[in-house]
Structure formats: structure tokens, C-alpha cells
């Protein structure tokens, strides 16, 4: 029987027990695709990343939820690169290329306030209209359609993974959501496997710009993601595209409703008519588990 060493890191926080936990497997080349899926299922984190050698980049990352493989995962990328830097396998002050199923993406490692920070350039933002029933979506989230923001549209967005961006009127609406994600596929008729990412301009922390929550597709094996890097990147791009935001940097908070307080920094730069979305976060080591497969 094979074993797998799974390191647990919590991303987008410097406090153990907060942020978004991810499993990190340093010896990803030792396992087949089926074995990686089994490891992710038994680890039970929203995502587990497997670090592998790459012929076209500095390294490859593959991401698995308990239910299926993902093209990209922001918090697991932060956790993986933080782990490699902490163990002396990568250096601060350098930019590395990582191969993912969303493409080859640059990742910068830097130090700020005495901590390692990871900056991931996400894929170019894309948007698609939501044509489903707003009342059914509200019902699936445990709120009413009156809780939706009147002036901003519900759309699907992606910087590597598709999610439904749902603007809300208030923090109170965010707090009272109790999702039934089994309803998502029939509500998200345009992209039935997408996740749902509601957000509001009202925040818990005064230094935050936006407050979000992230509810997973029922196919992923989880219900709520505590702090979501890729969806936060989509939120920043959404604010530029639909919110006419003049600012290029956003501090996005998430996880407060479930005791996993975390923050993601999103910065956008426009060049040649394209928007580049950069996501920055730190992480903290939690524990090591040995799983039999």
C-alpha cells in the first residue's frame, strides 16, 4: 500500500486556523492521476495540489478537489509556492513559471512585512451573461431576489475557472446566506458546473474594499470555500468591467462568516487593451498528514 505525505497550509492568512486550508503534495510525480484524486478525496480539503516536474515551465501544479480535477486554484497555488520557498526549494525575489491546465502562468515570490508573499498572474478575464432565473438563484442561496444589487449584473466570470459573480446589497444579505448547492446546476443553465461567488461593498474590516463568499459546485465535494484567490481576481476584473472602478487595487476579505478570516490583494494593470489580474497572498504551515492509498 502506497503512502502520501500531505502538508496542510492555510492560505491568505498568517494566523493558524484561519484563511483557506490546502493540501500540498511535494512529490506529485510519484502518483498517477487516479491516485492523486484518491489522495485529494481522503485529505478532504477544498483543493489539494500536486507539485510535479515540467518540461515547459519551472514546475507543474495539478489541483484536485475531493470530487474532480480543477484547471487552476489560487489558494492552493499560494500554499504550494509558500511551502517550496519555506523549504528552500524556491527563492524570494524571483519569478517562476508554473504549468497549469489554465496555461503557463508567472508567479512572483517576494517579502513584505517580514513574510513571504506569493503573487500569481491569472489568466485574462472573460465574462458571459447569466440568463437563468434570478429568483431560483436567490432561493438556492437562501436569500430573496431583493437582496441582489439593483445596479450591477449577475454574470459568469473567469480568470482560469468559471464562477457566477453575484453582487449583493448588504453585508447582512451575505451573512444570512445558507446555500443549497445541489440546486446550482439547474439554476446556472449557461455553465452548470460553475461555482457561485456573491459579494458586497459592505465589509467587516475597515481596510477592505469588498467582501465575498464562495459556494462550490456540487460536483466538487465541498460546499463553501473559505478564501478564494481565483474568484477574487474575477471580482477585481468585474469591478473594472461592470463597476467602472477607477482604482486598480482591491483588498478583498472572505471567510468571516465561517471563522476563517482571510484577505486577498488583487491588482490590475491594463496593457494593449488587455487587463492583467494579479493576486497576492501569504500562507502559514499547519500540519503534516500521512495518508495510505
Curated annotation (Swiss-Prot):
Matches recorded under SUPFAM superfamilies: Diaminopimelate epimerase-like
Protein name: Uncharacterized isomerase YfhB
Gene Ontology cellular component list: cytoplasm
EC number: 5.1.-.-
Active-site residues (renumbered): 47
Source species, domain of life: Bacteria
GO biological process terms held by the UniProt record: biosynthetic process
Gene: yfhB
Transmembrane segments: none
Pfam family, one: PhzC-PhzF
Record keywords, A-Z: Isomerase
Amino acid at each position: 500500500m502506497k503512502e502520501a505525505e500531505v502538508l496542510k497550509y492555510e492560505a491568505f492568512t498568517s494566523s493558524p486556523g484561519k484563511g483557506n486550508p490546502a493540501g500540498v503534495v511535494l512529490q506529485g510525480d510519484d502518483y498517477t492521476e487516479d491516485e492523486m484524486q484518491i489522495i485529494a478525496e481522503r485529505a478532504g480539503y477544498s483543493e489539494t495540489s500536486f507539485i510535479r516536474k515540467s518540461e515547459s515551465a519551472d514546475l507543474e501544479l495539478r489541483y484536485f478537489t475531493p470530487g474532480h480535477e480543477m484547471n487552476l486554484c489560487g489558494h492552493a497555488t499560494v500554499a504550494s509556492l509558500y511551502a517550496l520557498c519555506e523549504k528552500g526549494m524556491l527563492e524570494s525575489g524571483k519569478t517562476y513559471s508554473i504549468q497549469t491546465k489554465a496555461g503557463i502562468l508567472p508567479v512572483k515570490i517576494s517579502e513584505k512585512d517580514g513574510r513571504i508573499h506569493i503573487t500569481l498572474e491569472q489568466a485574462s478575464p472573460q465574462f458571459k451573461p447569466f440568463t437563468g432565473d434570478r429568483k431560483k438563484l436567490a432561493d438556492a442561496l437562501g436569500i430573496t431576489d431583493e437582496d441582489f444589487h439593483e445596479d450591477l449584473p449577475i454574470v459568469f466570470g473567469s480568470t482560469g475557472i468559471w464562477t457566477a459573480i453575484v453582487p449583493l446589497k448588504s453585508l447582512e444579505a451575505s451573512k444570512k446566506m445558507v446555500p443549497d448547492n445541489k440546486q446550482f446546476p439547474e439554476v446556472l443553465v449557461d455553465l452548470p458546473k460553475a461555482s457561485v461567488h456573491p459579494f458586497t461593498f459592505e465589509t467587516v474590516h475597515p481596510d477592505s474594499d469588498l467582501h465575498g463568499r464562495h459556494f462550490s459546485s456540487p460536483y466538487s465535494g465541498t460546499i463553501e470555500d473559505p478564501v478564494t484567490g481565483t474568484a477574487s481576481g474575477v471580482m477585481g476584473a468585474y469591478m473594472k468591467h461592470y463597476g467602472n472602478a477607477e482604482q486598480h487595487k482591491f483588498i478583498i476579505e472572505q471567510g468571516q462568516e465561517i471563522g476563517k478570516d482571510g484577505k486577498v490583494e488583487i491588482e490590475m494593470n491594463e496593457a494593449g487593451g488587455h487587463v492583467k489580474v494579479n493576486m497576492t497572498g501569504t500562507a502559514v504551515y499547519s500540519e503534516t498528514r500521512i495518508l495510505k492509498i
